[in-house]
Amino acid sequence: MTLRCLEPSGNGADRTRSQWGTAGLPEEQSPEAARLAKALRELSQTGWYWGSMTVNEAKEKLKEAPEGTFLIRDSSHSDYLLTISVKTSAGPTNLRIEYQDGKFRLDSIICVKSKLKQFDSVVHLIDYYVQMCKDKRTGPEAPRNGTVHLYLTKPLYTSAPTLQHFCRLAINKCTGTIWGLPLPTRLKDYLEEYKFQV
């Protein structure tokens, strides 16, 4: 998955990529820059965003990983910001995430794009497809007609996430109603910062 810039190739991608770390106050940012900065903050909390990494480095990291293991990295393509690298039955491959009109979706051929679900954040997109893969995958299935099935099942972490983050993931997997839990408001606020299961 690769995050596609709204700008044409060349300096546009570099300019937009630099907005991920925009230094200004939120009121100084354009709504687009604020959305991208928020998306990166959320993505950086995951532990599976690897930042700058080449295609070959991603392949090396995923080479011995089980099928369905994935990571997100900066794209080496000038028209995109992010790429998801995932291990398939045929080896590691890369997918693009497109960003348009404030929404993220998988990159695809034009005739399918309008049918693809769109998300407010990259993490929401990944969380959705991980959950979808859990629901659909019943076991190893031999590809037919040369087709390779692609599953997102397990993130490859840059380093072990904190125990707090693992606890937050466990709570998110058990309930969707954080504010109904008998917890202090400060802890509920922490849980609300990252509402995903992956």
UniProtKB/Swiss-Prot annotation:
Residues 1-29 are annotated as: Disordered. Transmembrane segments: none annotated. This is Suppressor of cytokine signaling 2. The SOCS box domain mediates the interaction with the Elongin BC complex, an adapter module in different E3 ubiquitin ligase complexes. GO terms for cellular component: Cul5-RING ubiquitin ligase complex; cytoplasm. Disruption phenotype: Mice deficient in Socs2 display gigantism: mice display considerable weight increase (30-40% more than normal) after 3 weeks of age. This is attributable to increase in visceral organ weight, carcass weight, long bone length and body length. In addition there is a thickening of the dermis due to excess collagen accumulation. Gigantism is caused by up-regulation of growth hormone receptor signaling pathway. There is a cross-link at K173 (Glycyl lysine isopeptide (Lys-Gly) (interchain with G-Cter in ubiquitin)). PANTHER family: PHOSPHATIDYLINOSITOL 3-KINASE REGULATORY SUBUNIT, SUPPRESSOR OF CYTOKINE SIGNALING 2. Substrate-recognition component of a cullin-5-RING E3 ubiquitin-protein ligase complex (ECS complex, also named CRL5 complex), which mediates the ubiquitination and subsequent proteasomal degradation of target proteins, such as EPOR and GHR. Specifically recognizes and binds phosphorylated proteins via its SH2 domain, promoting their ubiquitination. The ECS(SOCS2) complex acts as a key regulator of growth hormone receptor (GHR) levels by mediating ubiquitination and degradation of GHR, following GHR phosphorylation by JAK2. The lineage of its organism: Eukaryota, Metazoa, Chordata, Craniata, Vertebrata. Its main location: cytoplasm. The modification Phosphoserine is found at S30, S52. It is found in: Cytoplasm. GO terms for biological process: cell surface receptor signaling pathway via JAK-STAT; growth hormone receptor signaling pathway; intracellular signal transduction; lactation; mammary gland alveolus development; negative regulation of growth hormone receptor signaling pathway; negative regulation of multicellular organism growth; negative regulation of receptor signaling pathway via JAK-STAT. Residues 1-75 are annotated as: Interaction with AREL1. Expressed primarily in the testis, some expression in liver and lung. Keywords: Cytoplasm, Growth regulation, Isopeptide bond, Phosphoprotein, SH2 domain, Signal transduction inhibitor, Ubl conjugation, Ubl conjugation pathway. GO terms for molecular function: growth hormone receptor binding; insulin-like growth factor receptor binding; phosphorylation-dependent protein binding; ubiquitin-like ligase-substrate adaptor activity. Gene3D superfamilies: SH2 domain, SOCS box. Pathway: Protein modification; protein ubiquitination. CDD domains: SH2_SOCS2, SOCS_SOCS2. Residues 48-156 form the SH2 domain. SMART domains: SH2 (SM00252), SOCS (SM00253), SOCS_box (SM00969).
